[in-house]
């Protein structure tokens, strides 16, 4: 696996053709997951939900992006991760490049290329070395299906 840390306000990493892009949500109600980077971004229709589910700065962005981290699944089968090691950044796919921009000025970015689990593990390790780790005890979690509210209809439930 190739791994490096670079310091910059804006980072650009050549990836080769991007087939899929992993977008990380702004918070727990924001969309996260693998998407086609060539598909148009559709804003959340309802203004109240849009303000609560998406970063207002990027709610009407024409390009898909991830909060702090993005991963490209490339045509050659490799995965390339560009991840901020400080909050307040965004990563977007741009044809054969991952582009990151920090709202906090110059920051450290992790660039990792390898298998999917390797690049995600490298990011987790880099973040925990910077930000620390919580205890390993049981945690109570809350699961929300609110992101589906716009698509739920009486007919779909029945």
Regions found by a protein language model. Give the residues of each.
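N-terminal accessory beta-strand-rich subdomains and adjacent acidic, glycine-rich linkers
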Residues: 1-126
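An acidic-aromatic substrate-binding cleft motif
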Residues: 123-158
């Amino acid at each position: 696996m190739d791994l490096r840390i670079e310091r910059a306000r804006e980072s650009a990493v050549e990836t080769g053709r991007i087939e899929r892009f992993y977008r990380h949500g702004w918070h727990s109600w924001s969309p996260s997951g693998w998407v086609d980077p060539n598909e148009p971004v559709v804003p959340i229709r309802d203004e109240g939900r849009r303000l609560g589910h998406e970063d207002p700065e990027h709610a009407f962005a024409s390009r898909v992006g991830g909060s702090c981290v993005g991963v490209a699944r490339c045509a050659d089968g490799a995965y390339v991760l560009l991840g901020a090691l400080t909050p307040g950044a965004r990563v977007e796919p741009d044809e054969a490049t991952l582009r990151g921009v920090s709202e906090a000025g110059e920051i450290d970015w992790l660039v990792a290329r390898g298998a999917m689990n390797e690049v995600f593990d490298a990011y987790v390790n880099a973040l925990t070395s910077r930000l620390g780790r919580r205890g390993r005890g049981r945690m109570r979690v809350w699961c929300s299906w609110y992101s589906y509210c716009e698509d739920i209809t009486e007919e779909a439930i029945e």
